[in-house]
Protein backbone atom coordinates (compact mmCIF):
# COMPACT_ATOMS: atom_id res chain seq x y z
CA UNK A 1 0.00 0.00 0.00
CA UNK A 2 2.82 2.42 0.80
CA UNK A 3 4.34 1.85 -2.65
CA UNK A 4 1.19 3.26 -4.29
CA UNK A 5 1.54 6.46 -2.29
CA UNK A 6 5.18 7.14 -3.25
CA UNK A 7 4.48 8.61 -6.66
CA UNK A 8 6.67 11.48 -7.94
CA UNK A 9 3.69 13.78 -8.49
CA UNK A 10 2.48 13.42 -4.90
CA UNK A 11 3.03 16.38 -2.59
CA UNK A 12 5.22 14.78 0.04
CA UNK A 13 6.03 16.61 3.25
CA UNK A 14 9.53 18.02 3.60
CA UNK A 15 10.39 15.44 6.24
CA UNK A 16 9.62 12.44 4.00
CA UNK A 17 11.79 11.65 0.98
CA UNK A 18 9.59 8.84 -0.29
CA UNK A 19 11.33 6.15 1.74
CA UNK A 20 12.66 7.66 4.97
CA UNK A 21 11.37 10.01 7.63
CA UNK A 22 13.67 12.79 8.79
CA UNK A 23 12.74 13.10 12.48
CA UNK A 24 14.33 16.54 12.92
CA UNK A 25 12.43 18.05 9.98
CA UNK A 26 9.24 16.33 11.15
CA UNK A 27 9.64 17.95 14.57
CA UNK A 28 10.30 21.39 13.07
CA UNK A 29 7.09 21.17 11.05
CA UNK A 30 5.16 19.75 14.02
CA UNK A 31 6.26 22.66 16.21
CA UNK A 32 5.20 25.17 13.55
CA UNK A 33 1.70 23.68 13.54
CA UNK A 34 1.27 23.09 17.27
CA UNK A 35 2.08 25.21 20.31
CA UNK A 36 4.13 22.99 22.60
CA UNK A 37 7.35 23.31 24.60
CA UNK A 38 9.47 20.93 26.66
CA UNK A 39 10.78 22.06 30.05
CA UNK A 40 11.55 20.47 33.40
CA UNK A 41 11.13 16.97 31.96
CA UNK A 42 7.61 17.50 30.56
CA UNK A 43 5.74 18.88 27.57
CA UNK A 44 3.52 21.94 28.08
CA UNK A 45 0.73 23.28 25.85
CA UNK A 46 -1.92 26.00 26.17
CA UNK A 47 -3.88 23.39 28.16
CA UNK A 48 -1.06 22.96 30.69
CA UNK A 49 1.32 20.11 31.44
CA UNK A 50 1.00 17.02 29.26
CA UNK A 51 0.63 14.22 31.81
CA UNK A 52 -0.20 11.49 29.30
CA UNK A 53 1.71 11.44 26.03
CA UNK A 54 -0.72 9.04 24.33
CA UNK A 55 -2.73 11.84 22.61
CA UNK A 56 0.57 13.38 21.46
CA UNK A 57 1.67 9.99 20.12
CA UNK A 58 -1.71 9.76 18.35
CA UNK A 59 -1.15 13.12 16.64
CA UNK A 60 2.27 12.01 15.48
CA UNK A 61 0.86 8.71 14.24
CA UNK A 62 -1.85 10.54 12.25
CA UNK A 63 0.86 12.48 10.42
CA UNK A 64 3.07 9.42 9.88
CA UNK A 65 0.59 6.73 8.95
CA UNK A 66 0.64 7.41 5.22
CA UNK A 67 4.41 6.93 4.95
CA UNK A 68 5.69 4.81 7.86
CA UNK A 69 5.43 1.09 7.28
CA UNK A 70 7.84 -0.58 9.69
CA UNK A 71 8.38 -0.19 13.42
CA UNK A 72 5.84 2.62 13.76
CA UNK A 73 5.78 2.61 17.60
CA UNK A 74 9.58 2.85 17.72
CA UNK A 75 9.54 5.61 15.09
CA UNK A 76 7.01 7.57 17.18
CA UNK A 77 9.17 7.11 20.30
CA UNK A 78 12.23 8.36 18.38
CA UNK A 79 10.27 11.38 17.16
CA UNK A 80 9.14 12.16 20.71
CA UNK A 81 12.77 12.10 21.86
CA UNK A 82 13.80 14.48 19.06
CA UNK A 83 10.75 16.64 19.83
CA UNK A 84 11.99 17.00 23.42
CA UNK A 85 15.26 18.41 22.09
CA UNK A 86 13.61 20.61 19.46
CA UNK A 87 10.96 22.02 21.83
CA UNK A 88 13.31 22.46 24.80
CA UNK A 89 13.23 25.86 26.50
CA UNK A 90 15.88 26.80 29.06
CA UNK A 91 13.49 28.30 31.59
CA UNK A 92 9.74 28.10 32.10
CA UNK A 93 9.07 29.75 35.46
CA UNK A 94 5.62 29.62 37.05
CA UNK A 95 3.48 32.74 36.70
CA UNK A 96 2.61 33.75 40.23
CA UNK A 97 0.07 36.45 39.38
CA UNK A 98 -2.51 34.42 37.44
CA UNK A 99 -4.79 31.41 37.43
CA UNK A 100 -5.38 29.74 34.06
CA UNK A 101 -8.96 28.53 33.63
CA UNK A 102 -10.77 26.64 30.87
CA UNK A 103 -12.09 29.83 29.26
CA UNK A 104 -9.16 32.18 29.90
CA UNK A 105 -6.81 33.61 32.49
CA UNK A 106 -7.71 35.38 35.72
CA UNK A 107 -5.07 37.76 37.03
CA UNK A 108 -4.80 38.29 40.77
CA UNK A 109 -5.70 41.96 40.28
CA UNK A 110 -9.15 40.78 39.12
CA UNK A 111 -8.81 41.26 35.37
CA UNK A 112 -9.79 38.39 33.10
CA UNK A 113 -8.47 37.60 29.62
CA UNK A 114 -10.53 35.24 27.47
CA UNK A 115 -8.95 32.53 25.35
CA UNK A 116 -5.86 30.36 25.57
CA UNK A 117 -3.13 32.35 23.85
CA UNK A 118 -0.15 31.17 25.90
CA UNK A 119 1.53 27.92 26.80
CA UNK A 120 0.98 27.44 30.53
CA UNK A 121 2.16 25.18 33.35
CA UNK A 122 -1.38 24.27 34.38
CA UNK A 123 -4.97 25.07 33.47
CA UNK A 124 -7.90 24.33 35.76
CA UNK A 125 -10.91 22.68 34.07
CA UNK A 126 -13.23 25.35 35.47
CA UNK A 127 -14.76 28.25 33.56
CA UNK A 128 -14.57 31.73 35.05
CA UNK A 129 -17.96 33.39 35.44
CA UNK A 130 -17.85 36.90 36.95
CA UNK A 131 -21.65 36.86 37.31
CA UNK A 132 -21.81 33.57 39.22
CA UNK A 133 -24.03 33.50 42.28
CA UNK A 134 -22.59 32.86 45.73
CA UNK A 135 -21.90 29.16 46.41
CA UNK A 136 -24.62 28.80 49.05
CA UNK A 137 -24.05 25.11 49.82
CA UNK A 138 -20.30 25.67 50.25
CA UNK A 139 -20.82 28.72 52.46
CA UNK A 140 -23.35 26.83 54.61
CA UNK A 141 -20.87 23.96 54.94
CA UNK A 142 -18.13 26.36 56.06
CA UNK A 143 -20.52 28.06 58.48
CA UNK A 144 -21.30 24.70 60.10
CA UNK A 145 -17.63 23.69 60.19
CA UNK A 146 -15.78 26.83 61.30
CA UNK A 147 -16.20 29.96 63.34
CA UNK A 148 -17.13 32.96 61.19
CA UNK A 149 -13.73 34.62 61.77
CA UNK A 150 -11.90 31.47 60.56
CA UNK A 151 -13.67 31.25 57.18
CA UNK A 152 -11.56 33.99 55.48
CA UNK A 153 -8.39 32.17 56.61
CA UNK A 154 -9.52 28.94 54.95
CA UNK A 155 -10.52 30.82 51.80
CA UNK A 156 -7.11 32.51 51.69
CA UNK A 157 -5.40 29.12 52.13
CA UNK A 158 -7.42 27.66 49.26
CA UNK A 159 -6.47 30.67 47.14
CA UNK A 160 -2.78 30.01 47.81
CA UNK A 161 -3.32 26.44 46.60
CA UNK A 162 -4.32 27.86 43.19
CA UNK A 163 -1.14 29.87 42.61
CA UNK A 164 2.52 28.80 42.73
CA UNK A 165 3.39 31.13 45.60
CA UNK A 166 3.04 31.37 49.33
CA UNK A 167 3.66 35.11 49.54
CA UNK A 168 0.87 37.43 50.52
CA UNK A 169 -0.10 40.53 48.55
Placement of each model-derived feature along the sequence:
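Generic cytosolic/nucleocytoplasmic N-terminal low-complexity/intrinsically disordered segments
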Residues: 2-5, 10, 28, 33-34, ...
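Extracellular glycan-interacting surfaces
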Residues: 8-17, 70-73, 128, 132, ...
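Extended, Lys/Arg-enriched charged tracts that mediate electrostatic binding to polyanionic substrates
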Residues: 11, 15-21, 25, 69-106
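Phosphate-interacting basic helix/loop segments used at nucleotide- and nucleic-acid interfaces
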Residues: 16-34, 147-153
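Residues that form generic nucleotide/phosphate-binding pockets
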Residues: 29-30, 59, 63-67, 79-82, ...
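P-loop NTPase catalytic core of nucleic-acid-dependent motor ATPases
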Residues: 34-55, 99-100, 105-169
